Design a protein with these regions (language model features):
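A contiguous, low-structure linker/loop signature
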Residues: 53-105
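Active-site loop segments of alpha/beta catalytic cores
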Residues: 1-20, 69, 78, 96-308
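Acidic/polar N-terminal loop/beta-strand segments that form early-domain functional surfaces
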Residues: 1-2, 43-53, 71, 134
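N-terminal low-complexity, intrinsically disordered patches enriched in charged
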Residues: 25, 82, 296-297
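Segments that shape or occlude catalytic/ligand-binding pockets
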Residues: 10-55
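Short, glycine/charge-rich beta-strand/loop segments that flank catalytic centers
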Residues: 48-62, 108, 135-139
């Protein structure tokens, strides 16, 4: 659901189409507004994005691009055509007062919604696309914990400092709920789906003990979903979650997620037919094509078989 600038250019050149009106970046991982490509390919979904704040507006990617710090305190460095997030600005976290002293972003800055309602109304009234509210930040509370604290510290805190980690998770969730609130104020009547994002798995299984998800993370996901549903009852909740996450799926359903994206079909427990058989009555699976082998190395017949 997002393309880096370099990949976008390769696809545009390959298909040979020209753009007439394009915003360079949407402020998320330095990605382009690629609706012209979606139009060309005839896809049936369009994503709506919160706007970047002034300090997070960037120009075309090029040799002169320098690392920068975003409003979360995260450092963006250009690596092989995309910006890698680093810096771990809360790696020093030791006590609850550190959480409160941190300069958290203000979700309600006016520039985040400039022209957003008008764009949503235009797509809703004059197209037949399914409209999706793109995740308003890089990810939800677990994803952002890993960015702000660092992977190692995050995982250690779930075991050794559960009380402090839960205080951090609560604060993180509250800030993110503000982003969803301001987003839905503008696009809620027009979208059919809104996205959340948490990578809970590795290629081999869960990233952490699934019991921790149920004991701590579940209720925060549930709380966010309840707030979204209260403001926009018709909206379906899509979770972007990479990895071999089958063991999480019953709890994800219980938390209120309606759609899971992607399905990494080559990983343990992620066979699309088995997932549909076991969970299909409660969950929609989106994106089940093997992009690692079939799309890169398969022939046309392989791809057709995979899609079916």
């Amino acid at each position: 659901n997002h393309l880096t600038e370099n990949l976008y250019k390769l696809l545009k050149d390959y298909f040979g189409f020209k753009e007439t009106d394009r915003r360079t970046l949407v402020g998320f991982y330095s990605t382009p507004d690629y609706n012209p490509l979606l139009d060309y390919l005839g896809t049936d979904m369009r994503f709506l994005h919160l706007r970047p704040v002034d300090s997070f507006i960037m120009n075309e990617i090029g040799p002169s691009f320098q690392p920068f710090i975003d409003e979360w305190g995260l450092k963006h460095e250009l690596l092989s055509g995309y910006y890698n997030l680093g810096g771990e600005p809360l790696a020093h976290l030791e006590r609850q007062s550190d959480i409160e002293k941190y300069p958290w972003p203000d979700p309600y800055k006016a520039e985040r919604i400039t022209g957003l309602r008008e764009e949503a109304e235009q797509l809703y009234n004059f197209t037949e696309y399914s409209l999706v509210g793109h995740r308003p930040v890089y990810g939800n509370a677990w994803e952002m914990s890993r960015f702000l604290l660092g992977m190692e510290k995050t995982l250690l805190m779930t075991v050794k400092e559960k009380i402090l980690f839960e205080a951090f998770f609560d604060k993180m969730s509250n800030v993110l709920d503000g982003f969803y609130d301001v987003f839905l104020n503008e696009v809620g009547p027009f979208i059919q789906i809104i996205e959340m994002a948490e990578d809970l798995g590795t290629n081999n299984g869960p990233m952490f003990n699934p019991k921790f998800y149920k004991e701590v993370m579940w209720r925060y996901h549930r709380r966010t979903i309840e707030k979204i549903k209260k403001k926009a009852p018709h909206v379906k909740i899509m979770l972007h979650c990479d990895g071999a996450i089958r063991r999480f799926i019953p709890d994800l359903i219980d938390a209120g997620f309606d759609i899971l994206n992607p399905v990494e079909s080559d990983l343990i427990g992620m066979d699309p037919a088995e997932l549909k058989r076991d969970f299909g009555k409660d969950l929609v699976f989106m994106g089940g094509v093997d992009v690692k082998k079939i799309l890169t190395k398969g022939n046309r017949r392989d791809i057709q078989r995979e899609i079916r």
